[in-house]
């Protein structure tokens, strides 16, 4: 008798493990080319290191080393000073897909699914046929544990090839070494160097060292010793819950009554709100949640929309902050102007999120190319699929011409600008498992739009100010060319000394005039007066620096003193209203006439040089 075709087909059907699935679909996780595979591996390891260090309250110190081991193969070593991993967990952490501690935690974190580093181990054994080496230590008084691991793709379980105790110089930390088919590239935005540079900008508390295949070492120093505030885990918010998820929660809850179930299973639901929800759903607050079916669960979902429930708490987020974004950009770029913005937290589908933006302008950034957009999600750089990301779409939709940048044909504008956009959330809505781009969620796009426009307005103000300063500079150049010639001619006619033209220039320009008057007393002492006159129409606050090789006496007002080897920097904090004058005086006890004649130029800190006459000036930070 002929066997039915259905039975023949049934014999061929079998389940596959998640490891087998990703073994045949590695491109889903970002292992689709030789250069990208290396970047993805480094990214996953560095993410783990940063998360572990921050959770343990340790300032991260991370080493990334890449060595060529063949024409198409590299060995990559990532080492950190984190808390280490206990011996029993090492094989599962590195050689079991979908194994981790953050999947169910509702708080901001870099890694979540428990796939990343295990996928790198899987890729290494697939392409190079080699095991992965792990060394980890949890404290200075315990030995380090060394493992050599591979993944059994049929069972998604670790194969332990070696397990032994070793000595290690680090008091605590973890090291992973993988050999794989990959390529180390330079000079691209999508490279290990650019990835680590971007990581250093948004993680200014981390120190990251890169040793490339040629032995060159690049250190991205930390800009702060402050570890980010830890993100707190929160309960799910009713706004974003789905029917199936709610039914599962009702089925598995330990609560015996509906009202307590609502209070202790969701955030921002108190006693009164729970009663309101039950009333809106037409359900008894005392009913056993296990007895509720699909129909009742749907009523609860509808009640969540009817009852006013507070937004979820935002302590589950850990934004970078405007000051540290500024420091990160300042540390890793050479630019003329930096502006930052951190928006207030917002919510999409019950998930709190916050958008932060930094803008750097000028310096050595290319002037005739499209602006650079650096995208980040939960402090992790997004290097690929820029065109498919909501952050890029928000930038493209802004009319940049009104902010001083050209935008021929629309889209990304042209100019010497680096735009940093960071989205932090407990659940970043990526477009794919490879986490390359953020989905087009309207409220996220709106927040990005508002944050970018805020820094764009600051840029517009800066460019307008620079334009005005340029005009002043051109005007002053003309004046300083004409006036001296006039002064010489008038002095010759009147048979008098050529006068100092600085007061006249300052008055014409509306500048701040700063100059020194020295009166020698004939006994080796001298009285010095630093005179300040504000000819402008607005007030100025600034610092006056007097750099001298000797000590002074009788200073009025008393300056701050900074000692530098054999020299002294006397610093006065000065505020000068429009049209006002100030005098800073002091006495020098012993100085020759020649020394008095060679006193260094006064320095004014806090004002653009175009607004000051008679002294050297700089704006400062």
Curated annotation (Swiss-Prot):
GO molecular function annotations of the record: ATP binding; DNA binding; DNA topoisomerase type II (double strand cut, ATP-hydrolyzing) activity
UniProt family annotation: Belongs to the TOP6B family.
Entries under SMART domains matching the protein: HATPase_c
Keyword annotations of the record: ATP-binding, DNA-binding, Isomerase, Nucleotide-binding, Topoisomerase
One GO BP annotation of this record: DNA topological change
GO CC annotations on file: cytosol; small ribosomal subunit
EC code(s) of this entry: 5.6.2.2
Self-association and partners: Homodimer. Heterotetramer of two Top6A and two Top6B chains.
Main function: Relaxes both positive and negative superturns and exhibits a strong decatenase activity.
Identification of the protein by name: Type 2 DNA topoisomerase 6 subunit B
Lineage: Archaea, Methanobacteriati, Methanobacteriota, Stenosarchaea group, Methanomicrobia
Enzyme class: isomerase
Entry-linked Gene3D superfamilies: 1.10.8.50, 2.60.40.2960, 3.30.230.10, 6.10.20.80, Histidine kinase-like ATPase, C-terminal domain (3.30.565.10)
Residues binding ATP: 48, 80, 101-102, 111-118, 435
Catalyzed reaction equations: ATP-dependent breakage, passage and rejoining of double-stranded DNA
């Amino acid at each position: 008798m002929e066997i039915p075709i259905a039975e023949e087909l049934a014999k061929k059907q079998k389940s596959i493990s998640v490891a087998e699935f990703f073994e045949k679909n590695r491109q889903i996780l970002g292992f689709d080319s030789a250069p990208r595979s290396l970047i993805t591996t480094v990214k996953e390891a560095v993410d783990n290191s940063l998360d572990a260090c921050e959770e343990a309250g340790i300032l991260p110190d991370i080493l990334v080393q890449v060595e060529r081991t063949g024409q198409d193969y590299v060995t990559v070593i990532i080492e950190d000073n984190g808390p280490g991993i206990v011996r029993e967990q090492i094989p599962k952490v590195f050689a079991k897909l979908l194994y981790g501690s953050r999947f169910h935690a509702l708080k901001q974190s870099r890694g979540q699914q428990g796939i990343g580093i295990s996928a790198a181990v899987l890729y290494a054994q697939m392409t190079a046929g080699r095991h992965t080496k792990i060394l980890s230590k949890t404290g200075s008084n315990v030995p380090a544990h060394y493992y050599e691991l591979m993944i059994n793709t049929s069972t998604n379980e670790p194969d332990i090839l070696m397990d032994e105790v070793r000595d290690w110089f680090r008091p605590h930390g973890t090291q992973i070494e993988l050999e794989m088919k990959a390529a180390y590239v330079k000079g691209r935005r999508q490279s290990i160097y650019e990835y680590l540079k971007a990581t250093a900008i948004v993680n200014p508390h981390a120190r990251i060292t890169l040793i490339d295949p040629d032995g060159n070492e690049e250190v991205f120093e930390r800009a702060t010793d402050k570890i980010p505030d830890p993100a707190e885990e929160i309960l799910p918010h009713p706004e974003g819950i789905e029917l199936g998820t709610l039914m599962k929660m009702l089925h598995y809850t330990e609560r015996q009554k509906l009202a307590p179930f609502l209070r202790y299973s969701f955030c921002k639901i108190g006693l009164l709100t729970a009663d309101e929800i039950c009333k809106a759903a037409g359900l008894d607050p005392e009913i056993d949640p296990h007895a509720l079916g699909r129909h009742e669960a749907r009523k609860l979902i509808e009640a969540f929309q009817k009852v006013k429930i507070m937004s979820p708490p935002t302590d589950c987020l850990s934004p970078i902050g405007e000051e540290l974004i500024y420091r990160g950009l300042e540390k890793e770029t050479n630019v003329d102007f930096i502006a930052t913005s951190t928006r207030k937290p917002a919510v999409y589908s019950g998930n709190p999120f916050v958008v932060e933006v930094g803008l750097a302008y000028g310096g050595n950034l290319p002037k005739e190319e499209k602006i650079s957009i650096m995208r980040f999600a939960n402090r992790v750089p997004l290097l690929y699929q820029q065109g498919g990301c909501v952050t890029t779409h928000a930038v493209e939709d802004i009319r940049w011409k009104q902010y001083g940048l050209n935008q021929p044909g629309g889209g990304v504008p042209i100019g010497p600008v680096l735009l940093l956009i960071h989205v932090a959330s407990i659940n970043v809505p990526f477009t794919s498992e490879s986490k390359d781009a953020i989905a087009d969620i309207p409220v996220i796009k709106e927040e990005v739009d508002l944050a970018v426009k805020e820094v764009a307005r600051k840029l517009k103000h800066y460019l307008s100010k620079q334009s005005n300063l340029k005009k002043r500079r051109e005007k002053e150049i003309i004046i300083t060319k004409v006036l001296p010639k006039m002064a010489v001619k008038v002095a010759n006619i009147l048979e008098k000394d050529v006068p100092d033209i600085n007061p006249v220039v300052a008055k014409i320009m509306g500048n701040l005039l700063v100059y020194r008057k020295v009166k020698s007393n004939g006994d080796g002492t001298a009285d010095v007066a630093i005179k300040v006159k504000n000819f402008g129409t607005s007030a100025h606050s600034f610092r006056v620096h007097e750099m001298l090789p000797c000590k002074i006496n009788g200073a009025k007002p008393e300056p701050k003193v900074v000692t530098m080897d054999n020299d002294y920097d006397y610093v006065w904090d000065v505020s000068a209203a429009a049209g006002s004058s100030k005098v800073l005086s002091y006495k020098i006890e012993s100085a020759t006439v020649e020394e008095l004649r060679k006193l260094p130029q006064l320095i004014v800190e806090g004002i653009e040089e175009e607004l000051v006459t008679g002294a050297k000036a700089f704006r400062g930070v």
